[in-house]
Regions:
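Conserved hydrophobic beta-strand within the GNAT/NAT acetyltransferase core sheet
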Residues: 2, 37-42, 173
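Conserved catalytic-core motifs of GNAT/GCN5-like acyltransferases
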Residues: 35-41, 56-70, 193-205
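Non-membrane alpha-helical segments in proteins
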Residues: 4-6
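Intrinsically disordered, low-complexity, positively biased terminal segments
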Residues: 8-14, 22-36, 47-48, 84-222
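Conserved N-terminal entry element of GNAT/NAT acetyltransferase domains
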Residues: 67-87
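Short, structured loop/turn "capping" segments at alpha-beta junctions
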Residues: 58-60, 75, 102-108
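Short alpha-helical segment within the catalytic ATP-binding CA
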Residues: 19
Length: 222
C-alpha cells in the first residue's frame, strides 16, 4: 500500500515529486510477488496523475466528522457484546482482520491496538469475534480506524463504544463509499463529509469482505 506522498511547497514544480513517486512505485513492484497489487488512497486532484502510472479507480473513501458532546448510548441488545479487544485472542483478531485487509499484518496490529492514548474494542457474538475497532487521539480530536464488523448492528455497537473516547471533541471516521451500510452509519450519527480520497489499485483489486469495512485503518496505510 502506498501512502503519505507529500512534497513541500517550495520544492514543487521541479520534478522531484514525479521522480520520488516513480522510484517508490518501482521499488514496491520489485518487492511484490508476480500478480500482486498495490493500493493507494489518493487525493481527488491527483487521480489523473496516478492513472497515468497504471492505477485504476475503485471507489471513494470519505472522511466524516462529528462533534461528540457526550458518550453515545450503546444499543441495549449489544450490551455485553462489546468488550476490550485484549479479551479476544490475538489470533482471532488477526484472522478477522485478514478478511478485511488484503495482507497479513500481525506486527502492525500488535502495535496499533496497543498504542498509547487509544482504545481498542471487539464485538463478540455467539462466542466468536464479529468485529473490532480502534480509536486514537490525533492532532485534532480523535480518529476511528479501523472499524470492521459483520453487519450494521455490530458496527453500531462498536461505534458507540469508540465514540465515547472522543466525548467533548471532534471524531473522524474514514468511510468506504462502496459499503452502503457504512455510509448510513455516518449519516445516522450526523457526521459531515470533510475530505475524501480515491482508492486506486495497480493490478487487480483485492478480494476482501467490503461489506465488513465500515472504516479504513488510515488513508496512509490502507
Amino acid at each position: 500500500f502506498m501512502g503519505f506522498f507529500i512534497v513541500r511547497s517550495e520544492y514543487r514544480g521541479q520534478g522531484l515529486g514525479d521522480a520520488l513517486w516513480h522510484a517508490r512505485r518501482a521499488r514496491l513492484l520489485a518487492r511484490l510477488r508476480p500478480g500482486a497489487s498495490i493500493g493507494m488512497d489518493g487525493v481527488f486532484d491527483m487521480q489523473h496523475y496516478y492513472a497515468k502510472g497504471g492505477f485504476v479507480f475503485s471507489h471513494r473513501d470519505l472522511r466524516f466528522r462529528a462533534q461528540i458532546a457526550k458518550r453515545p448510548d450503546t444499543p441495549s441488545a449489544a450490551v455485553g457484546n462489546v468488550v476490550p479487544l485484549t479479551d479476544i485472542p490475538f489470533d482471532d483478531v488477526l484472522a478477522y482482520d485478514r478478511t478485511c485487509f488484503p495482507a497479513p499484518r500481525a506486527d502492525f496490529l500488535k502495535a496499533w491496538i496497543a498504542q498509547p492514548d487509544a482504545l481498542a474494542l471487539g464485538y463478540r457474538r455467539d462466542g466468536r469475534l464479529g468485529g473490532y475497532g480502534v480509536v486514537r487521539r490525533c492532532g485534532e480530536g480523535c480518529k476511528v480506524g479501523p472499524l470492521f464488523a459483520d453487519d450494521a448492528e455490530a458496527a453500531e455497537a462498536l461505534y458507540g463504544g469508540l465514540a465515547g473516547f472522543a466525548a467533548g471533541g471532534p471524531l473522524f471516521l474514514d468511510v468506504p463509499e462502496n459499503n452502503p451500510a457504512a455510509m448510513a452509519l455516518a449519516r445516522r450519527h450526523g457526521m459531515v463529509e470533510v475530505f475524501g480520497c480515491a482508492r486506486m489499485y495497480l493490478g487487480p483489486a483485492p478480494a476482501i469482505a467490503h461489506e465488513r469495512v465500515f472504516g479504513v485503518t488510515t488513508f496512509e496505510l490502507g
